């Protein structure tokens, strides 16, 4: 044994080779160290988890759970973190390990989302394959400051005669649509989106806490009318967790801000913020936050104000700064149409009063009008637009001055006329005119009207062309007049649709058109 070892010199290594080999091994040794901010779930109840041992967590941070899910840190307490699970939570158990990600929730943004239906996290749910979005954006962003804003002076045409004439909406405005259930709130918002299909305005429709069947119907209607290709639909249906319903409006807003910040115009509909407030109330109560009025938490005003302040018209300097000089000389806007559902017409409840005070006006839809067949059921008495007047199309503004007054006077006189049988001629004329205008403001769903169509209709009403027409024939007269005008005065129609201008020459042409029609046509 001893001899054989001594005799085998090939086995021997000198000391320098050994030290070189050790150095090589040390140099090539790769240590992968990962610092993880880890904690343990100590309780799970109703989608709320309490986590112990998770240090350095931000408010609103994403916390990674087993199974690739996430929770959102909302309560940062001395010895635990209260988080709300985004998604199913039935299989979560006490003792499970969770990890802080160090990231705030972000959603994909960009033109790749147009024409798609996504959930709150921006994941497609329409079965049309993955979305190859190049950018993401945080869901919570501070709204542009006063210096970055520009006054609202460009119109958003909803296609509704009653809205565009009496309660005009401008790009960058927040206009609340408020009313009881089944008064046509969603119908009005969807028609406004359909009317943008050729206006260059992108649309985002955020459905919060609605039935999946209702949302599917909305998507189908948008597709049928060719508006889906310019629209992003964000869905947090009634079956989703409260966390996703609470976050959906912010996610949709981030998608809309992508267009605003790049000098484009976008319109966002929140349908509806009452359900978002209820979801937030549920989360807050489960997190043991102290309840206030109607059991809502103290910060429910801030919940909506920080969302709606992000709808704005931003100036060209802001857009240029944001795009690093790529887009010059263009202002951007995000117009918001939040929807609030009232209970038995009570606009003085907590959430409705909050949102009324945040927004730049409201369109109030009344059950009585809706049931009487006045659709859209806009109440001109308490509906206002605080900033839209300066954004109204010139021709509509010039022609529609007397519409609101006529309707308000008619409502007042109609109530008075019930008690009196012998009315003087002037009162009868006013009542007759008010009835005709009310009839004329009726409009079918999914039939938004162009600027020319609205202008001609209002012109006919204001210049007394309806005075000798039976009430039941008013809408037939309107349809025949518009059909005649599109055929015989196509150039005038195209000019008004394009420019919205109004002068003596255009007025003379409108008068000639209406006179010719009444003299030669039947309806």
Swiss-Prot record:
CDD domains hit by this protein: ATP-synt_F1_alpha_C, ATP-synt_F1_alpha_N, F1-ATPase_alpha_CD
Key words of the record: ATP synthesis, ATP-binding, Cell inner membrane, Cell membrane, CF(1), Hydrogen ion transport, Ion transport, Membrane, Nucleotide-binding, Translocase, Transport
Membrane topology, from the record: Peripheral membrane protein
PROSITE patterns named in the record: ATPASE_ALPHA_BETA
Residues reported in the UniProt entry to bind ATP: 179-186
Site (Required for activity): 383
Cell location: Cell inner membrane
Enzyme Commission designation: 7.1.2.2
EC top class, as a word: translocase
Domain of life of the native organism: Bacteria
InterPro entries: ATP_synth_asu-like_sf (IPR023366), ATP_synth_asu_C (IPR000793), ATP_synth_asu_C_sf (IPR038376), ATP_synth_F1_a_nt-bd_dom (IPR033732), ATP_synth_F1_asu (IPR005294), ATPase_a/bsu_AS (IPR020003), ATPase_F1/V1/A1_a/bsu_N (IPR004100), ATPase_F1/V1/A1_a/bsu_N_sf (IPR036121)
Residue ranges the record marks as coiled coil: none
MF terms (GO), sorted A to Z: ADP binding; ATP binding; proton-transporting ATP synthase activity, rotational mechanism
Catalysed reactions, as listed in the record: ATP + H2O + 4 H(+)(in) = ADP + phosphate + 5 H(+)(out)
GO cellular component, one term: plasma membrane
Family as reported in the entry's similarity comment: Belongs to the ATPase alpha/beta chains family.
Cross-referenced PANTHER family: ATP SYNTHASE SUBUNIT ALPHA, MITOCHONDRIAL
Subunit structure, as described in the record: F-type ATPases have 2 components, CF(1) - the catalytic core - and CF(0) - the membrane proton channel. CF(1) has five subunits: alpha(3), beta(3), gamma(1), delta(1), epsilon(1). CF(0) has three main subunits: a(1), b(2) and c(9-12). The alpha and beta chains form an alternating ring which encloses part of the gamma chain. CF(1) is attached to CF(0) by a central stalk formed by the gamma and epsilon chains, while a peripheral stalk is formed by the delta and b chains.
General function of this protein: Produces ATP from ADP in the presence of a proton gradient across the membrane. The alpha chain is a regulatory subunit.
Full protein name: ATP synthase subunit alpha
Organism name: Vibrio vulnificus (strain YJ016)
Name of the gene: atpA
């Amino acid at each position: 044994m001893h001899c054989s070892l001594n005799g085998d010199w090939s086995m021997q290594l000198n000391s320098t080779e050994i030290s070189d080999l050790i150095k090589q091994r040390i140099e090539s040794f790769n240590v992968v160290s990962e610092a993880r901010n880890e904690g343990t779930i100590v309780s799970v109840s109703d989608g709320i988890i309490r986590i112990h041992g998770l240090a350095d967590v931000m408010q609103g941070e994403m916390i990674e759970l087993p199974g690739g899910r996430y929770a959102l840190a909302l309560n940062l307490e001395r010895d635990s973190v209260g988080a709300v699970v985004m998604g199913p939570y039935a299989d979560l158990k006490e003792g499970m390990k969770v990890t802080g990600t160090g990231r705030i929730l972000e959603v994909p943004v960009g033109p790749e989302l147009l024409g798609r239906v996504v959930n709150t996290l921006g994941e497609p749910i329409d079965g049309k394959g993955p979305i190859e979005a190049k950018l993401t954006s945080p869901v919570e962003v501070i709204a542009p400051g006063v210096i970055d804003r520009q006054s609202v002076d460009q119109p958003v045409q909803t296609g509704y005669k009653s809205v565009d004439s009496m309660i005009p909406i401008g790009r960058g405005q927040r206009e609340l649509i408020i009313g009881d259930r089944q008064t046509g709130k969603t119908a009005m918002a969807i028609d406004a989106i359909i009317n943008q299909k050729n206006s260059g305005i992108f649309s985002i429709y955020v459905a919060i806490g609605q039935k999946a069947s209702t949302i599917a119907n909305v998507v189908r209607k948008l597709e049928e009318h060719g508006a889906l290709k310019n629209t992003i639909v964000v869905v947090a249906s009634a079956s989703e967790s409260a966390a996703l319903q609470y976050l959906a409006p912010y996610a949709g807003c981030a998608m809309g801000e992508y267009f605003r910040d790049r000098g484009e115009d976008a319109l966002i509909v929140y349908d509806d913020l009452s359900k978002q407030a209820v979801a937030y109330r549920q989360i807050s109560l489960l997190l043991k936050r102290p309840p206030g009025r109607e059991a809502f938490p103290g910060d429910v005003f801030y919940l909506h104000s920080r969302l709606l302040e992000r709808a704005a018209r931003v100036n060209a300097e802001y857009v240029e700064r944001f795009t690093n000089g790529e887009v010059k000389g263009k202002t951007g806007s995000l117009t918001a149409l939040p929807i609030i559902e009232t209970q038995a017409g009570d606009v003085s409840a907590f959430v409705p009063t909050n949102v009324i005070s945040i927004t730049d006006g409201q369109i109030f839809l009344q059950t009585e009008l809706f049931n009487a067949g006045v659709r859209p059921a806009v109440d001109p008495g308490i509906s206002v637009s605080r900033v839209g007047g300066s954004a109204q199309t010139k021709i509509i503004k010039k022609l529609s001055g007397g519409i609101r007054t006529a309707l308000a006077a008619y409502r007042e006189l109609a109530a008075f006329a019930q008690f009196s049988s012998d009315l003087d001629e002037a009162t009868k004329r006013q009542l007759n005119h008010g009835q005709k205008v009310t009839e004329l403001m009726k409009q079918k769903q999914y039939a938004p009207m162009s600027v020319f169509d609205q202008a001609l209709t209002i012109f006919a009403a204001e210049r007394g062309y309806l005075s000798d027409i039976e009430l039941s024939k008013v809408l037939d007269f309107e349809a025949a007049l518009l059909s005649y005008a599109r055929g015989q005065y196509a150039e005038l129609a195209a000019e008004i649709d394009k420019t919205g201008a109004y002068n003596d020459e255009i007025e003379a042409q409108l008068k000639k058109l209406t006179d010719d029609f009444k003299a030669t046509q039947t309806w």
